[in-house]
Amino acid sequence: DAMGGDHAPQEIVKGAVMALSQDKELSVVLTGDEPSVRKCLEGQAYDASRLEVVHCTEVITNDESPTLAIRSKKDSSLVVALKMLKEAEEVKGLVSAGSTGAVLTGALLRVGRIRGISRPAVCPALPTAKGGKVLIIDAGANAECKTVNLAHFANMGTAYAKTMGVKTPRV
């Protein structure tokens, strides 16, 4: 989502180019206003065969109702990115610095959730002083949680930790 965030698309594009330089197996799809994204790419050194720009005509801002924006702005950079995440075999993840509410609402409405999981959770991975990582599941995104939600968060956090190579995660 090249248009999400206070400093988009400039900082998003710079971050995408940096990620490409750090991971030679990575490919990036930037969704957003193509002329603006291309202008930000000018003068940057990157492998053009690993970066695609998909033009979108709309942007979701932090001032909008997340649900209304996701439902009405079908050609927004976030909704198009979510659609690609769900439908495009080669798209495996999504990064957005935009509205957290819109990202979570969009993920729920456009991508769906694992059967049996009642609500999504934000899960940042933080570096530790010893060089490892710690996951903080939900990170305060849900103010009103029931016991079942906390159990689901624990299950999702465990699954995420295992994808990061942790053999026996502790919650």
Name what the model sees in each region.
Residues 1-108, 162-171:
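Contiguous, glycine/small-aliphatic-enriched amphipathic segments in soluble metabolic enzymes
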Residues 80-87, 119-127, 157-161:
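Short, charged beta->alpha transition segments
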Residues 75, 98, 116, 129, ...:
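Short, amphipathic alpha-helical segments
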Residues 26-28, 110, 122, 153-154:
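Short, charged/polar low-complexity linear motifs in solvent-exposed/disordered segments
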Residues 93, 104-140:
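Short, acidic/small-residue loops that bind anionic groups at enzyme active sites
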Residues 1-2, 110-113, 143-147:
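Acidic/glycine-enriched edge-of-secondary-structure segments
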